[in-house]
Swiss-Prot record:
Name the record gives this protein: Serine carboxypeptidase-like 36
Organism of this sequence: Arabidopsis thaliana
Carbohydrate attachment residues: 228, 312, 352, 418, 444
Enzyme type, top EC level: hydrolase
PANTHER family, alphabetized: SERINE CARBOXYPEPTIDASE-LIKE 36-RELATED, SERINE PROTEASE FAMILY S10 SERINE CARBOXYPEPTIDASE
Function: Probable carboxypeptidase.
Length: 482
């Protein structure tokens, strides 16, 4: 009797396991499709169908469905969001990415930095080389036909932490500087490429302007030093109106003003006599001479000495009729600030998700003034020469009416590199007109001036800027004939 009970128990357990196994298998093995002409509705009504929702990837989450106020003729994809560069410290950099209007598996990736330090690359995106500009109402956008995404995929990065929408959850110990920024920028790029792996094998160019004369070569150097860890196919760097060596470049501002009739011969002579002549140097007289020259700047746009000042910062109730993008609006910065502080805009571009307790501004002046002073004056020419020695092409371009970083100051820095000229100074052309002048040096460095442009070349001369950019990434000479 005991054996029979044991057998019964064993049989029950076996039956239970058998049924459980069948149920388990049914949940994993799909049922065959019903035969043609036979309805399956009656056969499966007793089953509960469980549907699992797919979880969007970080890339999919960053997809911008539509920018508020954007034109209707947009065919390219846009992305925006945050990438962690130091999770334990809670440091996140914000990016805005526009794919090219001509998608392809080989179209290059360009990373763009504005300067400052502490100035947002969204200024570059919406005032310079991106696909849109902001109307005077601060609410709507219009197309920029000379956007660089005509030729490449363009990634705009707000860096360093504290710039624009980028933030840190932990206090930053000490002053920010070049080294930490370069590390953050490198970590951003590595992590961003994991989010967008289709760009890992692409040709990559790093570009920027002003203080990006530090960011760009320093990031490029880290990439080359660590390419045995993470391969990044860096092809070249392109920097506009670059800050490369302030000890040299700072001496050219007053000379530039004098050469353009902005100060008198007497003012220039007094400055030279009391400030630069070691035998006649007099601090009090030098200070007075400098003050008189600085006073002349108050009447000028120092970023483009021939541009009008913004005299009315009030937004218009309706967007002004835009007759041509070639005429830069001196108040465009006000329009952009208004646009990026609209709640719906921030939600659309996945920015300010942590509700930063301050509004977006084009430049963080606190960060600017607290930047490591030694870093401001470091010379970047040794890094440029290292990059060139490893096959990285370098182009430096400069607007010829910029007072902040005159083209003469950039050219002076290039001359200190003692490079051999392989193609002498000559004009280059856009649409039959002189776009500026250019000179080529041994080691793959090209210097370009841009006629009629100031500190932000793509703002002042968008056609010229696009031609320079296209020439660079295609590795073709600028047009040499009208």
């Amino acid at each position: 009797m005991g054996k029979r009970q044991d057998w019964s128990v064993t049989a029950c357990i076996f039956l239970f396991l058998s049924l459980a196994s069948q149920i388990h298998c049914r949940s994993h093995i799909p049922f065959p499709s019903p035969k043609r002409g036979v309805s399956s509705s009656g056969d499966t009504s007793h089953f509960n169908v469980i549907q699992r929702e797919s979880v969007p990837s970080p890339k999919d989450k960053d997809l911008i469905q539509q920018l508020p106020g954007q034109p209707s003729d947009v065919t390219f994809k846009q992305y925006g969001g945050y990438v962690a560069v130091n999770k334990p410290a809670g440091r996140f950099l914000y990016y805005y990415f526009v794919e090219t209007i001509k998608p392809g598996n080989t179209t290059p990736l360009v990373i763009w930095f504005n300067g400052g330090p502490g100035c947002s690359s969204l200024g570059g995106a919406f005032k310079e080389l991106g696909p849109f500009r902001v109307h005077s109402d601060g609410k709507t956008l219009f197309r920029n036909p000379y956007s660089w995404n005509n030729e490449a995929n363009v990634l705009f990065l707000e860096t360093p932490v504290g710039t624009g929408f980028s933030y840190s959850n932990s206090p930053i110990n000490g002053k920010q500087g070049d080294k930490a920024t370069a590390e953050d920028n490198y970590m951003f790029l590595v992590n961003w490429l994991e989010r967008f792996p289709e760009y890992k094998g692409r040709d990559i160019y790093i570009a920027g302007q002003s203080y990006a004369g530090h960011y760009v070569p320093q990031l490029a150097q880290i990439i080359l030093h660590r390419n045995n860890q993470t391969l990044i196919n860096l092809r070249g760097i392109l920097i506009g109106n670059p800050s490369l060596n302030r000890e040299i470049q700072d001496d050219f501002g007053y000379k530039f003003m004098f050469s353009h009739g902005l100060i008198s011969q007497q003012q220039m002579d007094n400055y030279n006599k009391f400030c630069t002549d070691s035998d006649l140097y007099d601090w009090d007289k030098c200070h007075l001479a400098s003050q008189k020259i600085e006073a002349q700047k108050t009447h000028l746009d120092i970023y483009n000495i021939y541009a009008p000042l913004c005299l009315n910062s009030t937004l218009s109730s309706e967007p002004k009729k835009c007759t041509t993008i070639m005429k830069a609006d001196p108040c465009s910065g006000n329009y952009l600030k208004a646009y990026l502080n609209i709640k719906e805009v921030q939600e659309a571009i996945h920015a300010n998700t942590t509700k930063i307790p301050y509004e977006w501004t084009s430049c963080n002046t606190k960060l600017l003034w607290e930047w490591n002073e030694k870093d401001r004056y470091v010379s970047l020419t040794p890094i440029l020469q290292e990059l060139m020695g490893k096959g990285v092409r370098v182009m430096l371009y400069n607007g010829d009416v910029d007072l902040v970083i005159p083209f003469t100051s950039t050219l002076a820095v290039v001359k200190t590199m003692n490079l051999t000229v392989v193609k002498e100074w000559r004009p280059w052309f856009t649409g039959g007109h002189v776009g500026g002048f250019t000179e080529d040096y041994k080691g793959n460095l090209t210097f370009v001036t841009v006629k009629g442009a100031g500190h932000s070349v793509p703002t002042d001369q968008p056609i010229h800027a696009l031609n320079i950019f296209t020439s660079f990434i295609r590795n073709t000479p600028l047009p040499q004939t009208a």
